[in-house]
Every structure is written in structure tokens, then in C-alpha cells.
Amino acid sequence: SELFEETSIRSAEVGRYQLWLLDEGHCFRDQLVKFCHLKNAPNQRFSYSRGSLETFMHFVEQGNGVTFVPELAAKTLSAEQSELIRPFALPRPARCITLVHHRDYVRHAVVDRLSEVICQAVPKEMLRLRPGQDLV
């Protein structure tokens, strides 16, 4: 695919390719459809699957379309798979994790600890928006 010759991909270009997306209702899919303006894209070729990102990566490795991989998941790919990754051109999408609990929830220490564990598990550079990123 000519996408492999690009160093970055503009969100407007994505609609020209066979896309492997998670099922409707999955937040990652919904955010990408919004960011890339795919909802009403003419001639869009979507493929939905109950499969996983790993399954979609195998399709892409075989030359059968394109998919999206979250940055955190991309950090775990093999060197060969990483060579297939192309970042979005600016602005790049970013996602936000929000912890929500009922105002009467009494175990604030549990929520605080969960927040700490999440922040420790995520690379430090991913804890804040970086220049050129846009929340989706």
C-alpha cells in the first residue's frame, strides 16, 4: 500500500482504504470514527469484527487493509510490526481516562489507589497532552 511509503497519515486520507475496526459501541472505534470524520464518508469500506487488535494487525501484515493501534499497544509490537506503524499527522488524537464514582461512595482510598496504579502503569510521557495532540 502507498501508505507504507508515508511518514505520517492525515486523518482525511484514512477513508480511502479498507479499514479494520472494532465493533460499533467500542469506545476506541467510536473515537477514531469521530476523529477521522468517517461517519458519513462516501465509499468507505469498513470491516467490523469481534476480533482483536492482534487479529487486525495480522490482516494488515498480509496486506489486507489498515487498522488503528493505540500508542500503548504499539509499544509492545515486534520490530517487524512496528515498521508497519504510521503516526497520524498533526493534530494527533489522544484519549483521556476518567475515573467516575458516585458522590456517596465511601471508599475514596480505593479510587485514589486505582488512580495511582493506572498512572504508574502508563509511561510518564503519556500522562499529559503533548504538543500537536487533540483529545477525541
Language model: regions and residue ranges:
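Short beta-strand-to-loop elements that line the ligand-binding cleft
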Residues: 21-22, 42-52
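Short aromatic/hydrophobic contact patches that present stacked aromatics
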Residues: 18-20, 47, 98-100
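Secondary-structure junction motif
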Residues: 3-4, 18-39, 107-116, 122-133
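Beta-alpha-beta core module
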Residues: 4-9, 13, 54-104
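Conserved beta-strand edge residues that scaffold enzyme active sites
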Residues: 28, 50, 73-74
